[in-house]
Regions:
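Hydrophobic h-region of N-terminal signal peptides that target proteins for export
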Residues: 9-18
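Aromatic-patch recognition
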Residues: 24-164
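Positively charged n-region of N-terminal signal peptides that target proteins for export
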Residues: 1-4, 19
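Intrinsically disordered, low-complexity regions enriched in polar/acidic and amide residues
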Residues: 18-19, 91
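C-terminal partner/receptor-binding element of secreted or periplasmic proteins
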Residues: 154-187
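Residue-level detector of intrinsically disordered/flexible regions characterized by low predicted structural confidence
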Residues: 4-5, 103
Length: 187
């Protein structure tokens, strides 16, 4: 009886300790997933504007809210809801040959749209950031750098559907690009 009681007590203690293990580091090659609340600091000048560079500076994970520095090269996939309740998805894109960089998935389809954020002041929470866009159509990759010439490159990429390329001249911002690409992908 004493041996059975000791065995049950030892089993309960070992199970209780096994479930309280803190996550320290998950390597890139791991298939593990961290599901946690993260303290994603907003852009200091505008509380409703999310600064996508916060994961470069690290954020707090786990129940004890310990600071863990996570670099984008250590994260394969990152998904969260921003302050405007928009679902944001970032992942590494090996086909874009920028290994270790996270790209936001703006739109996927026949022509996919990805965005990479960067800054020259990424060491501060209030870093002003820039972005460059990548459009992928089959094996063709079109890179539009910061303040690049969207219209000319998009027209060339979408040239097989002339009715859509006419709309490229009137586009102004991201919403217009999304609408044009959604039309292209649906036809």
């Amino acid at each position: 009886m004493k041996k059975t009681f000791a065995f049950i007590l030892l089993s309960i203690i070992s199970l209780a300790n096994a479930q309280q293990t803190d996550i320290r580091y998950i390597p890139v090659i791991s298939t593990d997933t961290i599901s946690t609340k993260a303290n994603l600091y907003p852009h200091v000048l505008s509380k409703n504007k999310f600064n996508p560079l916060v994961f470069e500076n690290g954020f707090k994970v786990g129940e004890r809210r310990e600071a863990v520095r996570l670099w984008d090269k250590d994260i394969f996939y990152l998904e969260f809801t921003d302050r405007k309740m928009n679902k944001r998805v970032f992942r590494q894109m090996p086909e874009l040959k920028k290994n270790g960089k996270l790209f936001e998935i703006m739109l996927q389809g026949d022509v996919s749209w990805y965005r990479r954020y960067f800054s020259y002041r990424a060491d501060t929470w209030d870093a002003n950031y820039e972005h460059e866009d990548y459009f992928v159509k089959g094996d063709e990759i079109v890179n539009i750098p910061v303040k690049g010439r969207y219209k000319k490159k998009l027209k060339a990429l979408l040239s097989d559907k002339p009715e859509i390329t006419k709309e490229v001249d009137q586009m102004v911002g991201d919403r217009d690009i999304r609408e044009i690409l959604e039309k292209y992908n649906s036809k």
